[in-house]
Amino acid sequence: MWDWYTGILIWKTQNPWTSLRGQMYDWSLDVNASLYGTRKGCEPLHAYYNPVTRKAGLLNTTLKDYTDLSIVARIYNLEGKLLWEKETRASAKANTVQELLDIPVPEGIKGAYFLRLALNADVPNIYWLTTEPKDYTSLSQLPKSRPDIKTDIKKEGSNFVGTVRLSADSQISFFNRIKVFDKETGKRILPVHYSDNYITLMPGDQQEISLEFPANLPEERIQIVVDSYNSPLP
C-alpha cells in the first residue's frame, strides 16, 4: 500500500446509464456513501489500516512536517465491547507513509468487528473487519441502537445552513444516513451538501456534521431524518 500506488483515479462519478452500478451521486443529485469513503481515504494527513499487513500507519501527503502526533487504535465487537486498545505517538515528514502498529485479530471473535483509528482525537476512521473472508452477514446481529440527534438550521442568503450532531449510546450506531425532507410533501430535499454522511459511531462517540441546501421552502417545513442500519423501526 502506497509503495506502487499513491492515489486514485475516478473514472465515473455517476451512472452514464441506469443499468450501470457504481456511483458517487445519482440522477437526483443524492450523494452516495462511496463519495464520503473516498474523501475519507484521501485525507492528506490521516491514520490508516493496511489489511494485507494488518498494520495501522500514518500517511502524510502534504508538504509540511508534523511532530508528536497521537494515533489511538481500538477494536470493538458487535456488542460495542472494547476488546483492545493501543496508543502510539509519531512524527510524519512531508510526503511520507509509515506503518506503526500491529493490529491483532481478537481472540474468540467470529464474524464482523470494528477497528477505530483516531489521529489527534479527530473524527476517526472506522473499519469493518471480519474473521470470515468477504462475509459481513454477522452485521445483522448488531444490537438495536438509535443515536441522539440535535439539529441547528438557519437561513443565510439563499441557502439554509446548519449542523446535525449525532451521539451514540452504549451500543454501536452503524451507518447513519442523514436526509432532509419537506414535512408538508414528504419529499426529499435535494441537493444537500454534507460535510460527512453514512456515519458509524462507537459507544459514546459523537460527531457534528455541517450541511447546506437551497432555501426553496419555509424553514418550518424542514425535517431532518437519520436512518441507521441498526436503528429500531419507529
Regions inferred by a protein language model and the residue ranges of each:
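Carbohydrate-binding surfaces of carbohydrate-active enzymes
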Residues: 1-196, 202-211, 219-224, 232
